[in-house]
Amino acid sequence: TAANYRVNVPGIANLLIAHTHIAPAPVEVTEPAGPIAYWFSGGPPPGANLTERVNGTLADGFIITDGDVDDWDPMNTPDSGTVAGLIRAIKEGRASVVVHTDDLDPNTPTGVAGDSRAGELRGTLQ
């Protein structure tokens, strides 16, 4: 079992991290997005901040082994932390990608383009 992915972004600056969240229910009816299952960029904090603007493909590749996936719900989901579980969550509409940005300037108001630690871009994985 493997998953192929590509994350495209429209000219984003100050990329901090990008990852997949797995929610307990379909993303459009649950808040928050759920625990992190896979890191596209930046890795677990403190990841490196990318200062150049990214326009187009941010990340692409394959998720092949269960070791590539974080265990997002070990108590309640038998296939949590597996590639098969990630694929099932995507098919069920429970997986989303969140791209966080930060200009690393404490004087910049958060939530503006290029400085949104809460997630500048969000979308359901398909």
Predicted regions, residues:
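N-terminal leader/targeting pre-sequences
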Residues: 1-126
